[in-house]
């Protein structure tokens, strides 16, 4: 899929901005798709339950959500019954053109989790999931406004803050 608009069309979501979208997977039509390559950045929040994980000497239940980060050109299995793609969750899709010329565009390489393997996905707690969902909501609220000369800057800053929180959440995995 080359554009965010094409992604929206494939998943049955409305395009509010040509370069960025927040997609509710519980409302998405996954029936006609299998493996799809995205030509844009994709953050996938799966709200499907998973097992408790051991960090340090304790078990922590981070089954409230899992984050997967895809760089442009990466593929994911979109089969509805696939363990790789959830039927409940959210996608934040943003094209590299959105962040071009922004601080996020200059620093996107610092968010190394975009090059991690699927088994290195970030398992998050309920509190962390709420933070991610708040940013998804803020981005979506901005997308529901008419596009103006401030839209790109505001949306890219929200995405950058979301990614900064994700760095914090990844680092938490190695502290606990």
Regions found by a protein language model. Name each.
Residues 50, 68, 73-79, 99-100:
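Histidine-centered metal-chelating micro-motifs
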Residues 22, 43, 67-69, 91-93:
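Conserved hydrophobic/aromatic beta-strand scaffold that supports enzyme active sites
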Residues 130-176:
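An amphipathic alpha-helical interaction segment
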Residues 81-144:
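A hydrophobic/aromatic-rich effector-binding and dimerization subdomain
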Residues 1-54, 58-60:
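Generic protein-terminus/edge-of-domain signal
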Residues 57-71:
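Short acidic-glycine-tyrosine-enriched beta hairpin
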């Amino acid at each position: 899929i080359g554009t965010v608009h094409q992604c929206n069309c494939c998943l049955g979501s409305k395009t509010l901005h040509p370069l960025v979208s927040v997609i509710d997977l519980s409302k998405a039509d996954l029936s006609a798709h299998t493996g799809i390559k995205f030509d844009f950045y994709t953050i996938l929040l799966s709200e499907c339950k998973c097992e408790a994980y051991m960090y340090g000497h304790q078990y922590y239940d981070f089954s409230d959500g899992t984050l997967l980060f895809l760089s442009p050109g990466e593929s994911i299995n979109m089969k509805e019954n696939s363990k790789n793609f959830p039927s409940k969750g959210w996608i934040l899709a943003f094209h590299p053109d959105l962040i071009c010329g922004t601080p996020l565009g200059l620093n996107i390489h610092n968010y190394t989790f975009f090059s991690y393997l699927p088994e290195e996905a970030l398992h998050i707690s309920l509190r962390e999931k709420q933070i991610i969902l708040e940013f998804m909501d803020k981005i979506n609220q901005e997308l529901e406004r008419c596009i103006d000369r401030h839209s790109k800057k505001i949306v890219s800053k929200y995405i950058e803050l979301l990614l900064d929180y994700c760095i914090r959440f990844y680092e938490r995995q190695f502290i606990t």
